[in-house]
């Protein structure tokens, strides 16, 4: 038997594109006449599935699955919309989303091929979840903080699974995270198993639309279950691979939940690394809040804050006024941005050649 030829990446993308077109054509076969639709209402996007979205009626609280009008592309959890309910359900679809209201904020995630992909809208607070298992990464925390600062979304740092820490280890983690408190960020130590910090977390989430971000395996879904026990069966908890120690991807689509104690929560898919290549270096520099008092004071206007002579930011690091760890992470982020931009350009050129 002849060996089956493996598809190239370009062929795989074309197959997926054709599948999406067929699915979209099938979905568009569900058409609504004007006389089959009720009056326009305000709604809240709970989650989205392709050309469908689950919309909460802001008057009744009921959730209906709706089609999207042509031209509505970037609908995401947290969006406020205008929608019309069908007088009867058609193939499980109960209405149509007709317009998206202006957003106060938009969280996006870079994609190599498609540029920026929206993740969630109208976010008030970014809950950056880390964990003692698989391991705490201050570099990942700093990446999320850059995203939060550039989007003007208030960040909240949460260290999960602290029940696994011995006393000496806990003191070490507290020392690591004390720097973030020093520069003005709120830090919480929490555990679903012991209940530590859960009530404090509930207080911080009230009256806000919150999004949980963090690597896979840090326990975002387990915290959702701790905040809303009735969803224990609905939200699948991630397992840690015994072989690699890495978390398995669990949540497959961003979804908004109402927290019984107040506030809303959007649970988003975990990511291994939060891409920042779409930002300019100056934006990243300003996103490190403790750098701001020193910016503009270096000897040279184009100072890279590395080995440049007369760099007052590096002098501040040497004096202990700025964290050396944060300063090193800053340069790592800039280096990875340059690498990712180069890889993206290579991918785009390769895609154009296919």
From Swiss-Prot:
Binds 1 zinc ion per subunit. InterPro entries: G_CP_dom (IPR030378), NA-bd_OB-fold (IPR012340), P-loop_NTPase (IPR027417), Ribosome_biogen_GTPase_RsgA (IPR004881), RsgA_GTPase_dom (IPR010914). One of its GO terms (biological process) is ribosomal small subunit biogenesis. CDD domains: YjeQ_EngC (cd01854). It is found in: Cytoplasm. It is an enzyme of class 3 (hydrolase). GO terms for cellular component: cytoplasm. One of several proteins that assist in the late maturation steps of the functional core of the 30S ribosomal subunit. Helps release RbfA from mature subunits. May play a role in the assembly of ribosomal proteins into the subunit. Circularly permuted GTPase that catalyzes slow GTP hydrolysis, GTPase activity is stimulated by the 30S ribosomal subunit. Belongs to the TRAFAC class YlqF/YawG GTPase family. RsgA subfamily. NCBIfam families: PRK12288.1, ribosome small subunit-dependent GTPase A. This is Small ribosomal subunit biogenesis GTPase RsgA 1. The gene is rsgA1.
């Amino acid at each position: 038997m002849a060996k089956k030829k493996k598809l190239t990446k370009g062929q795989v993308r074309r197959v997926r594109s054709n599948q999406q077109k067929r699915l979209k054509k099938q979905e568009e076969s569900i058409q609504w006449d004007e006389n089959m639709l009720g009056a326009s209402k305000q709604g809240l996007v709970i989650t989205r599935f392709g050309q469908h979205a689950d919309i909460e009626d802001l008057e009744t609280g009921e959730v209906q699955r709706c089609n999207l009008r042509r031209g509505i592309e970037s609908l995401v959890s947290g969006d406020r919309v205008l929608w019309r309910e069908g007088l009867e359900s058609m193939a499980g679809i109960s209405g149509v989303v007709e317009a998206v209201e202006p957003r106060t904020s938009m969280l996006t995630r870079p994609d190599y091929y498609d540029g920026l992909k929206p993740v969630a809208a109208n976010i008030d607070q970014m809950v950056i979840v880390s964990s003692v298992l698989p391991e705490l990464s201050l570099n990942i925390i700093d990446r999320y903080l850059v995203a939060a600062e550039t989007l003007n979304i208030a960040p909240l740092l949460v260290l999960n699974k602290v029940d696994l820490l011995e006393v000496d280890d806990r003191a070490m983690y507290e020392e690591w995270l004390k720097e973030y408190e020093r520069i003005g960020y709120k830090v919480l130590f929490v555990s679903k198993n012991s209940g530590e910090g859960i009530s404090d977390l509930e207080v911080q989430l009230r009256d806000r639309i919150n999004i949980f971000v963090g690597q896979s395996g840090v326990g975002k879904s387990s915290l959702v279950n701790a905040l809303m026990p009735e969803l224990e069966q609905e939200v699948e908890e991630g397992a840690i691979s015994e072989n690699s120690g890495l978390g398995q991807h669990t949540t497959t689509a961003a979804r908004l939940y109402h927290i019984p104690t107040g506030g809303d929560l959007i649970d988003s898919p975990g990511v291994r690394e939060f891409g920042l290549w779409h930002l300019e270096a100056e934006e990243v520099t300003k996103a490190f809040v403790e750098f701001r008092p020193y910016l503009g004071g270096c000897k040279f206007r184009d100072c890279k804050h590395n080995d440049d002579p007369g760099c007052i930011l590096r002098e501040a690091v040497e004096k202990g006024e700025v964290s050396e760890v944060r300063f090193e992470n800053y340069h790592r982020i800039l280096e990875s941005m340059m690498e990712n931009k180069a890889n993206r350009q290579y991918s785009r050129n390769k895609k154009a050649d296919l």
